[in-house]
Amino acid sequence: IVIASDGYPESYSKGDVITGLDDIQIEDSRVFHSGTALEKNDIVTNGGRVLCAVALGKNVTEAAANAYAVAEQIDWKGSFYRRDIGYRAIKRERDEQSN
C-alpha cells in the first residue's frame, strides 16, 4: 500500500512529521521508506510517494487486511492511500472459495 502526500503527483508539502511508525506490531509486516528524511529525531515527508506498507497473510485477503492495518497506523498531515489495492485478487479468491 503506497502512502502518499496530499497533492501527489502534483505539488505536495515536505517536512511533515510522520507518526505511528514505532507503534506498528502487525506480524510479518514491513514499512519501506522512499520519500522520507530524518530531521532532528523525527522522520518527515520528503517526497510524494512517502512510504509503502506491506504484509503477509495465509491468503491474499488476510495479507491485504494486514497491510491496510499497518497503513492505518501511520499518519501525517495530508497522508492518503488507495483503499482498493488487491480488490481483484481478493474477489477472485472469494469466488474460488465459494465454488
What are these regions (language model features)?
Residues 2-99:
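Peripheral (often C-terminal) accessory segments that flank ATP-dependent C-N-forming ligase machineries
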